[in-house]
Amino acid sequence: MTITNEQVERINELARKKKAEGLSEAELEEQAFLRRAYLDSVKANFRSQVETIKVIDEKTGEDVTPDKLKEIQRKNGMRD
């Protein structure tokens, strides 16, 4: 799930309101939901970036990408 700029703005708005005056029960639930969505989005983006890495040995020029990562890349159609 990707998070929109509007959702990030809403997270910040709720955080400011929480500091200033507190949140209702519904707002607390909305804040928890939006925070979880944001964290899930960050994790998914990070995983996607890591899964595309190819590690090359500086001295030999040989591909030394860990086998586990190579297997994930093969599964996703990024390797032969």
UniProtKB/Swiss-Prot annotation:
Q: Which InterPro entries match?
A: DUF896 (IPR009242)
What keywords are assigned to this protein?
A: Cytoplasm
Q: Which SUPFAM superfamilies is this protein grouped with?
A: YnzC-like
List, alphabetically, the Pfam families matched.
Answer: DUF896
| Cell compartments where the protein resides | Cytoplasm
Which Gene3D superfamilies does this UniProt record tie to the protein?
Helix hairpin bin
Entry GO terms, CC: cytoplasm
Q: Does the keyword Transferase apply?
A: no
Sorted alphabetically, which HAMAP family does this protein's record hold? Answer: UPF0291
Similarity remark: Belongs to the UPF0291 family.
> This protein is called what?
UPF0291 protein LACR_1198
Native organism: Lactococcus lactis subsp. cremoris (strain SK11)
Biological classification of the source? Bacteria, Bacillati, Bacillota, Bacilli, Lactobacillales
